[in-house]
Amino acid sequence: MERAAVRKKIQMVFQDPYSSLNPKRTIEWTLEEPLKSCTKLGKKERKQKVQEILKIVGLDESYGQRYPGELSGGQRQRVSIAAALILDPEFVIADESVSALDVSVQAQILNLLQKLQKEKGLTYLFISHDLNVVQYMSDEIGVMYLGHLVELGDAQEVCSHPAHPYTKALLSAIPEVEGVRKERIVLEGEVPSPANVPEGCPFHTRCKEAQERCRKEYPAPRKVKEGHVVCCHNVAKV
């Protein structure tokens, strides 16, 4: 498949709406540029497409004549989403796409992403350090540590019954709901350099359950339940 065709099918929403948009170009220019590069639409059709996509993400067509510096963080991220959707992709990578926004604005953007997913049949790869956000947005969750996938499964299953020690520690750090008490798991030691990942299980230097085998042998994926896989020597196979 040619690169141009792949670009049309796969798009990305970046983390920082303050740096992902060209401050010297209008919003209309930013949204129209991909249409010039990847479609054969005429000028009138491109303008119409830009107006339509702005409306879809909740912005008036007048925003097309504005510059990024004239917009709020939430408005900029809506423009970033519009830029990702302007070519009608099938797959969208959202890389920490709400972490730079205020909490109230985060909720608006997440709801918008869900709405667009249902309307357009999109598939998202949603990257985030916030497990509350991940659980809200995802059907499946993959937990990574130092570039290695350590647990994968249904979102509700992983969050309700985590199997990997790292996943358990992450979930224990989520603030408690009133009346619900849980033990906080505090990880000790420093995070190793991703350029020099430890031999064996990459998590063994911070894991309280680590054994000699963990220090020497990388754990193969183990099925703990249908659709739930973990890479840990200390988890029993199903």
Question: Which residues does each predicted region cover?
Answer:
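Conserved ABC ATPase "signature" region
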Residues: 44-62, 171-172
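Conserved ABC ATPase signature
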Residues: 67-71, 75
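P-loop NTP-binding/switch modules centered on Walker-like glycine-rich loops
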Residues: 97, 101, 105-182
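A short, proline-enriched helix->beta-strand linker immediately N-terminal to the Walker B motif
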Residues: 86-90
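Short helical segment in ABC ATPase nucleotide-binding domains corresponding to the A-loop/adjacent helical element
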Residues: 18, 24-37, 47, 51, ...
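Catalytic Walker B motif of ABC-type/P-loop ATPase nucleotide-binding domains
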Residues: 92-95
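Short catalytic/signature loops enriched in Gly
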Residues: 3, 154-238
